[in-house]
Regions:
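Acidic, low-complexity Ser/Thr/Gly/Pro-rich repeat segments typical of extracellular/periplasmic
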Residues: 26-279, 284-305
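C-terminal subdomain of alpha/beta-hydrolase-fold enzymes, centered on the catalytic histidine
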Residues: 408-415, 477-698
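C-terminal segment of classical bacterial N-terminal signal peptides
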Residues: 16-24
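Structural recognition of the beta-strand scaffold that forms the well-ordered cores
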Residues: 92-94, 232, 292, 350-353, ...
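Cap/lid segment of the alpha/beta-hydrolase catalytic domain
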Residues: 303-333, 344-443
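Primarily recognizes the serine-hydrolase "nucleophile elbow" in alpha/beta-hydrolase
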Residues: 430-493
């Protein structure tokens, strides 16, 4: 992610317009956790039977259950109730008064393997298989959570995403307080557990008997339980059907209805060139030409696909629960392409590039991108990742003060994915860019583009959204996701970039607990446009009508902007192998580094992998120094950074390593070798060392 895309002035003005207001008590709350109406979250308490749904359920929230902003408006986005289950990356949230995580012995982020201990106090079981799901648990350690009365949620995170369409049971048992005493169950749950439910929970007895039976089978004693509940994950179709429908109809209109074969067919998308800039060698020794234009893309949003537009859906057929977006004309998507000088003699490999947080395709002229283009003869093209592009900043500001409107971001992200797919097809269709004079070599008069294959190479937000794009892509089969991760509800509270957002978010929703709940809720919509919702289909299990893909995930150790833990969760979800040694001594907080991620070997180097890049400990020149916060350390000429904190806070010490991997020649060499038709993950670091970013020697 790139920092401070939201204009501080705009944020300040918007924040000042929020005025306090009271709100009525919510109804329809689960009595099993009375701290907040949404707790425990997620829970099948908030679902209803739905005919035609792939899970036989749909979400069933109401506005009265959601936190209100200071204007008194509920943060409930109605689009949530189109989901047939919850996010595959859901954090499991509840409030346990007085819990001490260490005394309880719950699996921590530093030792995930503890989840499988026979007496593990926090267990998540897949109802279908009876197997435990790997998790780690923490209390919210953000300063606002600690200072807020009853503000520290128990947060249980999946170490890899939950399976689509599966139902899980959460079991909390033998929880301890700071003195080591067992925390008693709440009255409502105790009545269910003891077989004598009363009041509001009496009608749930039959359902809970099934839960207790499953837990008994898993050797979890009913009498030991503090709390248990179940939840169901959204189905593959529900998560992806909007984007797949948009893709399939758009490519069919071009004359290509067989996208699974990975072959280009039909006509090229319509486009126009607005500007051609030829550079002298004095202007750029690396890039020969930049071309700016617009490509015509089917539009599936209101407002002509402008920021704030949302989807409308075709009427479902009888007995069908689906969400198929209506096409609403077309839109003109901006593109920028840069042709390297090397392409004037040898056609360049074409690659899409995705920009940073709330950024723009102008980032395609960054030094590291031009280096990659020049060193490895690659032509990069970019289009705004609308939904989260610079033009969406006003909408983002509005959403932070009113989360009920969040579907406008999620919907436009999916349109942005389609725009990138259409641009990619234009790059490799022989009658597209390759046939245009603007894309021909000035030396040979031949096309400067090698149209035999398309690739994806991106960083930060471009990588977070890029996993979703990869899962949907019919044209590129290999993607590099640089300094990325997945699951914004996990990423943002652990990112320094969130400081800027909270200039609006905190005044609008004053409780940290409410803000965490809202982030967790909107993740169910965010999934439709980022890797978290497509994780099970990025590599090994392609979506319908889609070829298989491989990815190379580059991670910056201790990244200040994209939480490293989210990248490792992504690696486990995507089935990646990991380059070892991943860390030098003392450079990981994990008892078992890269836990449950197999090792990269010569035998699997043709597949998908995770590689961690280390900028080294804090130092000024060659002298190791105490780490200061990023800006202060930067002013002193400091480089390097410590390992990320283990809590739910952002790393702030040392120089932010976020941009270092892409600035490292060895990392670019590794990317280039991977981004070939028969590419592999090559070894570019000493065999007995972790990979070091530029500036940190071996």
């Amino acid at each position: 992610m790139l920092k401070n895309r939201l204009a501080v002035a705009a944020i300040t003005v918007a924040a000042l317009t929020l005025v306090p207001a009271g709100g009525a008590a919510a109804s329809g709350c689960d009595p099993l956790d009375t701290r907040s109406c949404l707790l425990p979250f997620p829970s099948n308490f908030n679902t209803v039977a739905q005919k035609g749904s792939d899970t036989s359920l749909r979400l069933n929230f109401s506005a009265s259950q959601f936190p209100k902003n200071v204007k008194g408006k509920s943060g409930f986005p109605p689009e949530l109730n189109r989901n047939d289950g919850f996010s595959p990356g859901s954090a499991l949230l509840t409030y346990v008064p007085g819990i001490d995580i260490a005394k309880t012995g719950a699996a921590p982020i530093t030792d995930i393997a503890q989840y499988s201990k026979a007496n593990a106090p926090i267990v998540v079981i897949d109802v279908k298989t009876g197997q435990r799901h790997p998790i780690w648990a923490e209390l919210d350690t953000n300063a606002d959570a600690i200072s807020e009365a009853k503000g520290q949620l128990l947060m249980i995170h999946p170490a890899k995403n939950f399976l689509e369409g599966h139902t899980y049971i959460v079991a909390l048992r033998d929880l301890k307080n700071s003195t080591g005493k067992t925390i008693p169950a709440g009255a409502a749950f105790a009545s269910l557990r003891n077989g004598k439910p009363t009041g509001a929970v009496k009608a749930r007895r039959a359902g809970y008997e099934k839960i207790f039976k499953a837990l008994t089978k898993a050797k979890i004693a009913r009498s030991s339980l503090y709390l248990a509940w179940d939840f169901t994950i959204a189905s593959e179709r529900n998560l992806s059907e909007r984007a797949l429908s948009m893709r399939n109809r758009s490519f069919a209109a071009l004359g290509d209805s067989n996208l699974a074969d990975g072959k280009v067919a039909g006509k090229a998308p319509v486009y126009k060139i607005d500007r051609i800039e030829d550079y002298s060698t004095a202007q750029s020794t690396r890039i020969a030409r930049q071309i700016t234009g617009h490509v015509t893309v089917p539009c599936f949003l209101t407002k002509g696909c402008a920021t704030g537009g949302t989807m409308s859906y075709a009427k479902s057929k009888k007995g069908k629960f689906d969400s198929i977006p209506n096409q609403q004309g077309t839109m003109q998507a901006l593109f920028i392409c840069r042709i390297p000088r090397a392409a004037m003699t040898t056609p360049a490999r074409p690659s899409l590039y995705g920009h940073g947080l709330l950024g723009s395709p102008d980032e395609i002229d960054a030094g590291n991108v031009d280096d990659m283009a020049s060193e490895h003869n690659m032509m990069f093209c970019a289009t705004p990742e609308i939904g989260m592009a610079d033009e969406d900043v006003p909408n983002a500001i509005e959403l932070l003060g009113d989360m009920s409107k969040f579907s406008s971001m999620a919907d436009r992200l999916q349109q942005g994915l389609l725009n990138e797919l259409i641009l990619g097809r234009l790059m490799i269709n022989p009658s597209g860019f390759a046939a245009a004079e603007a894309f021909k070599s000035t030396s040979t008069s031949q096309s400067a583009i090698d149209t035999s294959a398309l690739y994806y190479d991106s960083n930060s937000q471009g990588a977070i959204l890029g996993g979703a794009l990869t899962a949907l892509s019919p044209d590129f089969k290999r993607a590099v996701l640089g300094v990325g991760g997945m699951n914004y509800s996990l990423l943002l509270p652990r990112s320094v970039d969130f400081d800027t957002y909270e200039l609006i978010f905190k005044p609008a929703y004053k409780s940290r607990l409410d803000r965490i709940l809202l982030l967790s809720a909107i993740q169910n919509l965010w999934d439709r446009g980022e890797t978290n919702g497509y994780g099970q289909h990025v590599t090994n299990k392609p979506l319908p009508g889609t070829p298989k893909h491989d990815v190379l995930l580059h991670v910056a150790l201790g990244d200040h902007q994209v939480a490293q833990v989210s990248a490792e969760n992504e690696a486990r979800t995507l089935g990646l192998v990991g380059r070892r040694p991943a860390y030098d001594a003392g450079r990981s907080f994990d008892k078992t580094p890269l836990w449950n991620i197999p090792s990269l070997t010569a035998g699997n180097a043709g597949g998908s992998a995770l590689v961690i890049w280390d900028s080294g400990p804090c130092r000024i020149g060659s002298v190791f120094e105490t780490c200061l916060e990023n800006d202060a350390f930067d002013k002193l000429g400091g480089v390097g950074n410590p390992v990320a904190p283990t809590g739910s806070v952002a790393p702030r010490l040392g120089r932010d390593p976020h941009s270092r991997p892409r600035s490292t020649p060895a990392a670019r060499q590794q990317k280039s070798e991977f981004l070939k038709p028969a590419g592999k993950i090559t070894e570019v670091c000493p065999a007995n060392s972790a990979c070091h970013s530029v500036g940190w020697g071996y």
